[in-house]
Structures are given as C-alpha cells and as structure tokens.
Amino acid sequence: MDTKAFKRSLQQSNNYHRKGFGHETEVMGTMNTEYQSSLIQKIRENNYQWQEGDVTIKLAEAFGFCWGVERAVAMAYETRQHFPQEKIWITNEIIHNPSVNQRLLEMNVGFIEVINGSKDFSVVEAGDVVILPAFGASVTEMQLLNDKGCTIVDTTCPWVSKVWNSVEKHKKKDYTSIIHGKYKHEETVATSSFAGTYLVVLNLKEAQYVCDYILNGGNKDEFLEKFKNAHSEGFDPDKDLIRLGIANQTTMLKSETEQIGKLFETTMLKKYGPTELNEHFMSFNTICDATQERQDAMLNLVEEEVDVMVVIGGFNSSNTTHLQEISIEKGIDSYHIDSDKRILPGNKIEHKPLEKDIETKENWLPDGKIIVGVTSGASTPDKVVEAVIERIFEEKNAGVLV
C-alpha cells in the first residue's frame, strides 16, 4: 500500500481535521483552570525550589505537559465543543495520563475497547467523530475509519509524523527501518504501519545482537524467534539487513537512541567500508525536542543534592519510565507514581518499580530535613504535580514522621 498517497488523500478529505475548530481561546481557558497550578508557577519563579517545614522540593527545569500533548488535549476539548451532540470516540488513550483520560470520559468521549488483543471498531458508525490520539494511529485503523464514513480528528504529535516521514523515505529507497522502541507501544505500532520492511529493537542489547548477526551471521531461526513480534511480515535477516535506516519511538531514552544509531552506522561501516556506507545506511534526527529537554533536565537534577526522587506520570508512559531510569542509574531512591493518591498515610507510598508491578513501600521519606526531587512525564498536568507536592508536605510536616 502507498501509505504516503493514502495519507495525502485522507488529509484532503472534508471529513479530516488536524487544525482544530476555532475554539482555541475558550478551550485554553478551560484547560488552564483544570490543569495549571499557581503553586507550580511559584516554584518555577523561585528557581525551581520550594521549602515548607522540613521539606525542600527541587523541581526539574523541564517537566510536565509538552507542546504536542497540550495540543492533542486541546483538540479533544475543541472536538467535544464543536460536535456537542455527535457520538465521539477515541482510538486509544489521548495521552498516557489517567486524570486526563478520565476527564474525557466525563465529557462523554468513548474509548474503543480492546477485546482479545484487538480494538473493537464495530461500535463505530458512519457519521461518528473519531479522535486519533497524540501517539497516532496505524494506517489500517485510519483506512477503516475513513471507509466507515467517520469524521476524523487527528491529534497526532508532529514529532511522531516526522518519524513516519522518515520510515516512508526508508521504504521508498528499499531500506529496512530499524525502529528503536517498544513494539507494543501505540506510537511504534503506528510508525511500523508506515514502514516497508522493519525491525523493532528495544534497547542497546538487542541492537548489538542484530549488529553481530550483520557482521558474523548466525542462526536465522533463533533471530526470528527473538524478534517474533517485532518485525514486518516475511522479514529475513539474511536479506533485509543490507540497507538500513534508523528511526525511533519519540519517547525513548535519547542517549540510547543515539548509541543505537551510532552502533548501526559503525557496523555498516565495518561491513561495507566508507565509500559504500551511504548506500547501506541512512539516519534522520527524529529525537523529540520535548523528550530531550525533559531528559536533560533530569540529568541535571540527579547531579544535585537529593534524598528522594518522585517521578510522576502514567504507569504506561514510556517517557516517564525513562526519567525514572535516569534517577535509578544515579543510585537515588526513586518512586514512580501516577497521582497524589499513591502517597498513603503513615509514610507509605504505592509506586511502580522498573519492569515490576505496583508495590507499597513503608518509611519512604527519611527522618529530619529532606530534599525531594520532583519531575513529571510529558503527559502529566501541573495540577497533578501540585497535588503530589502538597501530599508530601502534608505527610512530612504533619507530625506523622519523627
């Protein structure tokens, strides 16, 4: 399928909307009321620090809602206002934040249910309005919704669209797209649908395995079993690793994406030499600015004096998880929570360790005066960050801890 031609045709349709509906001013007023925080603004203006009693909060200098997320949420609000009576669906969570998604449910926006691993689009009828989330949607989903005669509101982040353009360039020149990402993540599912031949690698370890195969060969069956859910149909590592292009899920760890790109470039250089490199390797910078800014701010924060780190964001948020990784790698006691309700009375906290289920930690706040580092993922409103900080102050300064 010519995905580029389909996308162009869809964008020219009267049923396709990507620029809102002219209600920006009113919607931004509503969003400011629901999601902004006067306390967080004060902390920003106070050099990202705030003290109450025995607690000093240090905020990362870049955190929370990014432009792409704010744009997606605003478009969803505009859609409800512009279509007050129509049935509105969204193909997935608008962003990975439970409070924002709950707000959309309260606005009578339906979420497409997943049944036996597949989305049930049978509930969508002609004339319904369907929102595509910030992560985007697969070509198959867009085609299905277009064929049904739905009004499509596309809130896909432009940074994600940039990655799609990159893999389409790979496809046009018969390059295999090496996608650094999580093969089940909505964004990577969408990106791979625009690619031709592709392989998804999760991390540097998997990338090294692929590069070793390129240089030394190996067991094809073992390779295909290792990546059984992470490649295009009919993928053959003996034929499809000769010309490679690099792309990434925009929320992955920036430093690892760069390392993976460099590793593949070096591998192809060894395999084919400098004069042939450009015939076998291509790379475009598709690292999201907002992801990079938040990770850089976290790298700075972990170098400061911090007793405990709190990372706020949806548990299924990839960019939030990578912020957590930065803190853990520095050896800081770090707690990933999705709301203030995870901070329990009696100095307890429900949190999600990396690659584990939610667990409860007792005595998580140390005795005496403490410095708590705080950051949040790109899908987390300031209001949620404020609520978490207020709970920390409440627990620590209310005489609960001695």
From Swiss-Prot:
Q: Secretion signal: which residues?
A: none
What family classification does the UniProt entry report for this protein? Belongs to the IspH family.
Q: Which PANTHER family match?
A: 4-HYDROXY-3-METHYLBUT-2-ENYL DIPHOSPHATE REDUCTASE, CHLOROPLASTIC
Q: Which cofactor does it need?
A: [4Fe-4S] cluster
Keywords of the record, alphabetical order, are: 4Fe-4S, Iron, Iron-sulfur, Isoprene biosynthesis, Metal-binding, Oxidoreductase
Question: Which pathway, metabolic or otherwise, does it act in?
Answer: Isoprenoid biosynthesis; dimethylallyl diphosphate biosynthesis; dimethylallyl diphosphate from (2E)-4-hydroxy-3-methylbutenyl diphosphate: step 1/1; Isoprenoid biosynthesis; isopentenyl diphosphate biosynthesis via DXP pathway; isopentenyl diphosphate from 1-deoxy-D-xylulose 5-phosphate: step 6/6
The positions flagged as active site in the entry are 187
Species whose genome carries this gene: Crocosphaera subtropica (strain ATCC 51142 / BH68) (Cyanothece sp. (strain ATCC 51142))
Q: What is its EC number?
A: 1.17.7.4
Binding positions for isopentenyl diphosphate?
96, 185, 317-319, 379
Matching InterPro entries: LytB/IspH
Example of a GO MF term: 4-hydroxy-3-methylbut-2-enyl diphosphate reductase activity
Which superkingdom?
Bacteria
Q: Which residues bind (2E)-4-hydroxy-3-methylbut-2-enyl diphosphate?
A: 96, 185, 250, 317-319, 379
Q: Which reaction does it catalyse?
A: isopentenyl diphosphate + 2 oxidized [2Fe-2S]-[ferredoxin] + H2O = (2E)-4-hydroxy-3-methylbut-2-enyl diphosphate + 2 reduced [2Fe-2S]-[ferredoxin] + 2 H(+); dimethylallyl diphosphate + 2 oxidized [2Fe-2S]-[ferredoxin] + H2O = (2E)-4-hydroxy-3-methylbut-2-enyl diphosphate + 2 reduced [2Fe-2S]-[ferredoxin] + 2 H(+)
Enzyme class, top EC level, equals oxidoreductase
Q: Which gene encodes it?
A: ispH
Question: What are the binding positions for dimethylallyl diphosphate in this chain?
Answer: 96, 185, 317-319, 379
Q: Name one GO biological process term.
A: dimethylallyl diphosphate biosynthetic process
Residues involved in [4Fe-4S] cluster binding: 66, 157, 288
- Give the cofactor note: Binds 1 [4Fe-4S] cluster per subunit.
Coiled-coil annotated residue ranges, if any? none
Annotated function: Catalyzes the conversion of 1-hydroxy-2-methyl-2-(E)-butenyl 4-diphosphate (HMBPP) into a mixture of isopentenyl diphosphate (IPP) and dimethylallyl diphosphate (DMAPP). Acts in the terminal step of the DOXP/MEP pathway for isoprenoid precursor biosynthesis.
Taxonomic lineage? Bacteria, Bacillati, Cyanobacteriota, Cyanophyceae, Oscillatoriophycideae
- Recorded protein name is 4-hydroxy-3-methylbut-2-enyl diphosphate reductase
- A Pfam family of this chain: LYTB
